[in-house]
Amino acid sequence: MCSSDLLHEFFGNIYEEVYSNSIDKTAEYIRTLDEYTPGSFERYNELSQIQGQTKIPRARLMIEELLADNTTMINLLNDCFDAAEAEDQQGIANFIAERLDAHAKHGWMLKSFLKDQRA
């Protein structure tokens, strides 16, 4: 079983990687297309395909839900990659490819945690 300190550090690393490496860049790429990002938390939630948690789940369920959300994110990124390539937006496609690599890594790490918890 993974210690809570190890999981806390792991989740913190994912949080830092996602928020440090994607949020601002995503917004900047959206602006290069003369579009605007959602301007409020409510609008962001309306558009989101990933739902937040209202309770604090046990560690295993937390990992399972994060893995499912990560898979959703990979599917969305694949759709975005295809759209960027179809519109000949190579810079955006490259950025999305980097995000896909990062989420693939998150996925195998989450699966590894789940496998280790079965032992």
How should these model regions be labeled?
Residues 24, 28-29, 38, 42-98:
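Acidic/histidine-rich alpha-helical segments that form the ligand environment
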Residues 18-19, 70, 77, 103, ...:
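Amphipathic alpha-helical coiled-coil segments
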Residues 25, 94-119:
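Short, contiguous alpha-helical
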Residues 1-3:
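Short, small-residue-biased leader/transition segments that mark boundaries at the very start
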